[in-house]
Amino acid sequence: MSWNLFKGGPKKQIVPKTVERDFEREYGKLQQLEDQIKKLQKDMKKSIEADLAMSKSAVRISSDLLGNPLCEPDVDFLQMVTALDTAMKRMDAFNQEKVNQIQKTVMDPLKRYSSVFPSLNMAVKRREQALQDYKRLQTKVEKYEEKDKTGAMIAKLHQAREELRPVRDDFEAKNHQLLDEMPKFYNSRTDFFKPSFQSLIRAQVVYYTEMSRVFGDLAQQVDEVQLSDAEREQENEARLAELRSLSIVADD
């Protein structure tokens, strides 16, 4: 939005430059805040969707393994995959609880806070329209003041001043209200969002505490023999070599 005086405007300074600078500064801070809130909403939504996709995918993988012929001949392997499936379902359940908590305590407040900005922007537009009306009528008054003071011109000047008065009062009321309330709204952001992000942190702490238990339980149920990465790779290569020795997979 442009705050420059329109061409052919009144000679009289309608709004002091210091007041206009204060207005631009306060409104600029709120515009920046609105952009930041929108970005935060977008990023939080992506994070929630990614969290849910991750846990749902993990459950699908463990369920697929349970129904895979790989598990049929080996009881120990089947027990391990069953334990994995149980762990993934527990993880998904806790993840859903975390997401529900974040939705209620973070996303919903963000949405409610964002809903205020359209009304704020509309109030600024009404203030700008009132300012333009004020300038237009002030220019009209000044034009008549410069004319010869004939009876007809004095009557026109009087009428123009009468038209100007309520328009000026309307602008000054709108301007004063915005200058008073915009800083209050901006300064309220910390008190409004602090509880939400405290809840976000608590939800994350609870979730990862539960995940520590879930995977701790899983670790106790799997094979206690731990192989290093090098040993595991060596074992896999040996098994793969055995498979390649079979005639059905031999190169022609």
Curated annotation (Swiss-Prot):
Q: Where in the cell is it found?
A: Cytoplasm, Cytoskeleton
Q: Give coiled-coil spans as residue ranges.
A: 17-57, 119-150, 224-244
Q: Which Pfam families match?
A: BAR
Alphabetized UniProt keyword annotations: Cell cycle, Cell division, Coiled coil, Cytoplasm, Cytoskeleton, Septation
* BP term (GO), one: actin cortical patch localization
The record's section on PROSITE patterns has:
BAR
Q: Which domain of life is it from?
A: Eukaryota
Q: What is its main location?
A: cytoplasm
Q: Which GO terms describe its cellular component?
A: actin cytoskeleton; cytoplasm
Could you tell me which residue ranges the BAR domain spans?
8-231
Query: GO molecular function of the protein, one example?
Result: lipid binding
Q: Which SUPFAM superfamilies match?
A: BAR/IMD domain-like
Its biological function?
Involved in cytokinesis and septation where it has a role in the localization of F-actin.
Protein name as catalogued: Bridging integrator 3 homolog
**Species name:** Xenopus laevis (African clawed frog)
